[in-house]
């Protein structure tokens, strides 16, 4: 067979093997002769495809026919790189031109072909191929990048045209293989690329959690009962009669019901599972599971339900000794996850070493739990250490009960002391019936010193304390500002311990309740406690039962009640103690009765004080100024009786004007300062309260401040047919504290806004001129209510007028200026003319007649002055020779100041003299 036939058969064989047209095609004449430059390596996918093509061309007897084809001649197709080996080609980053050639019958000296693949004809004339060396063919295939499919030129030693017998890769494969060598080398060295979708495409979907209370909407009691019965039937357990009855009694299913009481019921796992039909539809305030014989499975199921459905705010799991580790783990998960649980009672439920870490981890996270009962839970040692460490960071727990846990005085007490140093949120710490001892009390007191605003109640009942430990407690009490209840009952404190404790109790100002029951006290200790009672202004309750307190101690306690007004309850033994003298027994009974009466008295005082505080709070919320009708009704009710007495006192005082002083003030009913508060006012001196007994018209002292009063004011009322009251203004004559002083104090209360009260101080005229004024007063009609006093014509008349002007408030000055209208000014002019023409006595008579006419004219007109004052007030103060009313005093002061006097100095002197003369 010649070379031409073999080449034709090779092309047919490739076509029969379903080689695609993209792999083998006829090249152009130029491509047959010249090698193609710039040929790129194929990618990995193309290599696999080409390897599959070669595999389909293999025969089963490759190795046996290889030698035969070498002897008979073969067509060798080689694709050797020009510049180097296959290894050099892989490492090179620069593309090298490839030269491919096809030689027929070129065999080396050793009889082997220098290509990777041999194509030969077997005995039957079937074209076969076999790699000369399998390893060489694999290396050639990988290094040359499938050179058989790349640009291949077949050289034939024949005279036939080259274009009819050439095999080449078509030009369409060149762009596909034109990938940079750098990227191909990077992929081959294992550099992979990972891409992620955009943020919007990452989450393909979401599922909302199921609503735990989806079954509780529009549900009825019958539906709940039916669901519970069906659950019991499905679980093959009997319905609990107590559950059926309590469910039947449910009223409002939209709110939390009071209680689900399962106390004493034996709950196994199936019974607990059936309760889910109740919990998923109804919520409760308290779920009582006390002594229900819960095991690990049942407890876990119930706690998971309560956590998921938030079934309870208060949970009682006490007296369940078989909850186990899984039960406590579920309970801890419930405490950590639920937001509704506030109270957990786990007394008499063991919390052992392997369960304590779960509870500690739950308490470290600030959950909603505020009250935790762990009495008799066996938490001494490591469990207490874990709990105390966790509670240092807890911010919500308020009450911690650790009674009857056999806490010792070393390690456990040290943990409690450290807890008190760091946690300022615990308000109640109950350590009763433990073994704290005096050594442990020292640790607790170290932490107690840091509790300046946290701990309120500390119970150390029955902790084997003695008088030695009271020293630590007495040293800590002055530092505690929040401790209100201290219970030291059933400890051997003794008289010596009470003496040590007394100083600390007196220094402490926060203790309200003190428990000293059964502390081995006698009369000596009772005397020390009595000293504390007398010094304490806040103590409310004291328990001294089961102590040998006899006559001497009871006498000291009884005397202490004469000073103390705060102690409301003192617990003592009802029966008197045995005495050697029989009469002392009756004395003890009498003293006990006195102590009881003292408690009752303090209780009444406390109740009155509380009512007073309530009234003060109410008055603070009311309007500052009441309506005139309301105040008028209050005036008629409260002041009916004092008015008559005021009139009588005023009549007597007018007859003896030389030694009596007048006081113009509002009339108000005296009040008990301890039981009735004073109303608020707008006075600038609300805080100045100096009660003085200056009025003789009332049964109890009326509080009158030195400068301005804050007491209740009464608006003006219609004139009463009395010589003492005109237009709501009351004139009260009272004796002054210093009778030697000729001054007179007039207190005027304005019924307008602000309840202003001002003082007017005057100096009396000499006695001879006052007698003349009294004679003139008798000639005036009784209806004219005036106090006529002739002032001296010397400096004594000018100085009090200046004082009165200095003492007046702006409201009073405004009233005076308004009152200086035509009646008063006309009177002044007429009086001036009379002094020039008539004698002194005729002048006095004329002034008296003119003033009387002015009073009648003002009474007829009744034109009120500002703040409700009527013009009668303008005629209230005038004396003998010239009118001396407040208005005329204002005019005279102005005239005197124009003569060169300094106004500021006069006001200062007037205020100083007023402060001395005023009561």
From Swiss-Prot:
Residues 626-716, 790-866 are annotated as: Disordered. Residues 631-640, 677-690 have a biased composition (Acidic residues). Residues 641-658 have a biased composition (Basic and acidic residues). Transmembrane segments: none annotated. Residues 791-801, 811-837 have a biased composition (Polar residues). SMART domains: LRR_RI (SM00368). LRR repeats lie at residues 340-361, 368-388, 396-417, 425-445, 454-474, 482-502. Signal peptide: none annotated. GO terms for molecular function: protein phosphatase inhibitor activity. PROSITE patterns: LRR (PS51450). Keywords: Coiled coil, Leucine-rich repeat, Protein phosphatase inhibitor, Repeat. Residues 691-701 have a biased composition (Low complexity). Residues 833-861 form a coiled coil. It comes from the Eukaryota. The keyword Repeat applies. Pfam families: LRR_6. May inhibit phosphatase activity of protein phosphatase 1 (PP1) complexes. Belongs to the PPP1R37 family. This is Protein phosphatase 1 regulatory subunit 37.
């Amino acid at each position: 067979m010649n070379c031409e036939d073999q080449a034709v058969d090779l092309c047919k064989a490739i076509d029969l093997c379903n080689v695609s047209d993209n792999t083998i095609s006829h090249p152009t004449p130029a491509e047959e002769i010249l090698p193609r430059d710039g040929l790129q390596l194929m990618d990995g996918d193309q290599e696999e495809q080409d390897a599959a093509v070669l595999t389909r061309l293999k025969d089963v007897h490759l190795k046996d026919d290889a030698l035969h084809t070498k002897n008979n001649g073969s067509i060798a197709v080689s694709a050797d790189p020009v510049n180097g080996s296959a290894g050099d080609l892989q490492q090179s980053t620069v593309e090298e031109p490839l030269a491919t050639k096809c030689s027929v019958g070129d065999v080396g000296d050793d009889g082997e072909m220098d290509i990777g693949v041999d194509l030969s004809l077997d005995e039957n004339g079937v074209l076969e191929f076999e790699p000369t060396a399998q390893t060489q063919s694999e290396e050639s295939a990988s290094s040359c990048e499938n050179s058989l499919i790349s640009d291949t030129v077949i050289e034939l030693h024949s005279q036939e045209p080259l274009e009819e017998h050439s095999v080449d890769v078509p030009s369409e494969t060149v762009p596909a293989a034109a990938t940079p060598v750098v990227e191909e080398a990077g992929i081959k060295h294992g550099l992979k690329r990972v891409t992620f979708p955009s943020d919007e495409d990452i989450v393909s979907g979401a599922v909302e959690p199921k609503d735990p209370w989806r079954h509780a909407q529009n549900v009825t009691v019958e539906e709940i009962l039916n669901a519970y019965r069906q659950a019991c039937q499905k679980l093959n357990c009997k319905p609990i009669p107590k559950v059926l009855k309590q469910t039947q009694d449910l009223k409002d299913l939209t709110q939390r019901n009071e209680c689900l009481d399962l106390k004493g019921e034996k709950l196994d796992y199936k019974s607990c599972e059936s309760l889910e039909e109740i919990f998923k539809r109804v919520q409760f305030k308290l779920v009582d599971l006390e002594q229900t014989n819960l095991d690990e499975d049942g407890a876990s199921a119930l706690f998971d339900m309560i956590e998921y459905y938030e079934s309870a705010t208060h949970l009682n799991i006490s007296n369940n000794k078989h909850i186990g580790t899984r039960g406590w783990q579920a309970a801890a998960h419930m405490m950590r996850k639920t937001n509704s649980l506030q109270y957990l009672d786990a007394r008499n439920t063991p919390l052992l070493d392997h369960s304590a870490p779960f509870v500690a981890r739950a308490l470290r996270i600030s959950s909603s739990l505020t009250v935790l009962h762990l009495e008799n839970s066996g938490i001494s040692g490591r469990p207490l250490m874990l709990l105390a460490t966790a509670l240092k960071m807890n911010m919500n727990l308020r009450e911690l009960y650790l009674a009857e846990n056999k806490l010792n005085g070393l390690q456990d007490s040290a943990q409690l002391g450290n807890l008190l140093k760091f946690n300022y949120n615990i308000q109640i710490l109950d350590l009763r019936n433990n073994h704290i001892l005096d050594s442990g009390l020292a640790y607790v007191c170290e932490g107690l010193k840091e509790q300046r605003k946290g701990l309120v109640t500390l119970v150390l009942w029955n902790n084997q304390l003695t008088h030695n430990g009271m020293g630590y407690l007495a040293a800590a009490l002055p530092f505690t500002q929040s401790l209100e209840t201290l219970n030291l009952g059933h400890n051997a404190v003794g008289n010596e311990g009470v003496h040590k404790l007394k100083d600390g109790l007196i220094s402490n100002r926060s203790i309200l309740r003190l428990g000293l029951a059964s502390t081995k006290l006698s009369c000596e200790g009772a005397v020390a406690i009595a000293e504390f009672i007398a010094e304490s202004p806040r103590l409310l309750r004291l328990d001294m039962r089961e102590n040998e307190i006899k006559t001497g101690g009871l006498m000291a306690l009884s005397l202490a009640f004469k000073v103390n007004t705060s102690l409301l309850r003192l617990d003592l033994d009802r029966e008197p103690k045995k005495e050697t003298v029989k009469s002392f027994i009756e004395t003890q009974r009498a003293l006990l009765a006195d102590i009881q009466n003292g408690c009752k008295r303090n209780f009444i005082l406390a109740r009155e004080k509380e009512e007073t505080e309530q009234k003060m709070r109410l008055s603070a919320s009311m309007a500052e100024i009441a309506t005139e009708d309301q105040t008028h009704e209050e005036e008629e009710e409260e002041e009916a009786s004092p008015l008559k007495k005021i009139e009588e006192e005023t009549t007597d005082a007018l007859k003896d004007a030389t030694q009596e002083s007048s006081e113009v003030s509002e009339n108000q009913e005296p009040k008990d300062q301890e039981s009735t508060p004073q109303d608020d006012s707008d006075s600038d001196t609300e805080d100045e309260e100096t009660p003085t007994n200056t009025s003789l018209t009332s049964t109890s002292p009326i509080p009158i401040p030195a400068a301005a009063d804050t007491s209740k004011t009464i608006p003006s009322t219609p004139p009463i047919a009395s010589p003492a009251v005109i237009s709501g203004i009351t004139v009260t004559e009272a004796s002054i504290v210093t009778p030697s002083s000729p001054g007179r104090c007039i207190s005027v209360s304005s019924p307008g806004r602000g309840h202003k009260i001002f003082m007017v101080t005057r100096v009396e005229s000499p006695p001879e001129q006052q007698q003349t004024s009294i004679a003139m007063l008798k000639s005036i009609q009784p209806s004219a209510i005036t106090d006529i006093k002739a002032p001296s014509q010397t400096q004594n008349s000018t100085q009090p007028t200046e004082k009165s002007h200095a003492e007046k408030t702006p409201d009073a000055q405004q009233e005076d200026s308004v009152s200086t209208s035509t009646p008063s000014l006309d009177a002044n002019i007429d009086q001036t003319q009379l002094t020039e023409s008539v004698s002194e006595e005729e002048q006095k008579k004329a002034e008296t007649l003119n003033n009387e006419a002015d009073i009648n004219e003002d009474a007829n007109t009744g034109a009120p002055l500002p703040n409700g004052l009527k013009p009668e007030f303008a005629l209230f103060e005038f004396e003998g020779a010239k009118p001396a009313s407040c208005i005329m005093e204002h005019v005279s002061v102005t005239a005197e100041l124009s003569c060169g006097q300094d106004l500021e100095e006069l006001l200062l002197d007037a205020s100083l003299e007023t402060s001395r003369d005023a009561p």
